[in-house]
């Protein structure tokens, strides 16, 4: 109780002291000699107040600018991380950049060599017609996105295109043997050639196809459940069709 009374007395005394100071300042303001000085001080206070308002607005602007710069830095950091991720995960099946032939300096033809070339000699054999081996096209990101989730499960875009790369390897290996003259074949290739012929049907005529035996012969792929899932996806993406018969499934490149 005594403590509260002392606090109240202290508070009242403080207020009385403030009133006395105000009254003394008021009396000073009535002095004609000080009115001009007080007026100037008032003008200075107004000017300082306006300056403080400008400082406050500038501080708000700087805070907004700082916030925008932080957001920009964060956005740039994320973009840099995305670029680094792309650099580190470039699909291996993408074509490599090569120098074009137009940039390669070709030496001027030697007139003497041209004269020699024009001299009649032994007739040359006509060049053998280059046979084109049809390869499977890689799937695009849009096509991969359209594959139902239940079908692709945890398979990635790159994993599917890696399988396509191996399938193309098997196709090229098979049809290089098919296009090779039989006289130059080894016994192993001759046996493979005969198997290729036996596997053909009227439905595969004029088309490039492989069977599981070709996958095992020319690649290191395992013909397992994952392989069949990917073949199902490739059929969904119209990269191949299946021709069955004689206990074989022929994967026709479309």
Swiss-Prot record:
Component of the SKA complex, a microtubule plus end-binding complex of the outer kinetochore that stabilizes spindle microtubule-kinetochore attachments, promotes alignment of chromosomes at the mitotic spindle equator (chromosome congression) and assists suppression of the spindle assembly checkpoint. Kinetochores, consisting of a centromere-associated inner segment and a microtubule-contacting outer segment, play a crucial role in chromosome segregation by mediating the physical connection between centromeric DNA and spindle microtubules. Residues 56-90 form a coiled coil. The keyword Cell division applies. A motif (Slightly degenerated SXLP motif) lies at residues 92-95. The modification Phosphoserine is found at residue 241. Keywords: Cell cycle, Cell division, Centromere, Chromosome, Coiled coil, Cytoplasm, Cytoskeleton, Kinetochore, Microtubule, Mitosis, Phosphoprotein. Component of the SKA complex, composed of SKA1, SKA2 and SKA3. The SKA complex is a homodimer organized around a central W-shaped coiled-coil structure, formed by the interacting domains of SKA1, SKA2, and SKA3, each end of the 'W' is extended further by the C-terminal microtubule-binding domains of SKA1 and SKA3; the complex forms extended structures on microtubules. Interacts (via SXLP motif) with MAPRE1 (via C-terminus); the interaction is direct and stabilizes the kinetochore-microtubule attachment of the SKA1 complex. GO terms for molecular function: microtubule binding. Residues 88-129 are annotated as: Disordered. This is SKA complex subunit 1. The modification Phosphothreonine is found at residue 156. It is found in: Cytoplasm, Cytoskeleton, Spindle; Chromosome, Centromere, Kinetochore; Cytoplasm, Cytoskeleton, Microtubule organizing center, Centrosome. Residues 105-129 have a biased composition (Basic and acidic residues). The gene is Ska1. Residues 91-131 are annotated as: Flexiple loop that anchors MAPRE1. Pfam families: SKA1. It comes from Mus musculus (Mouse).
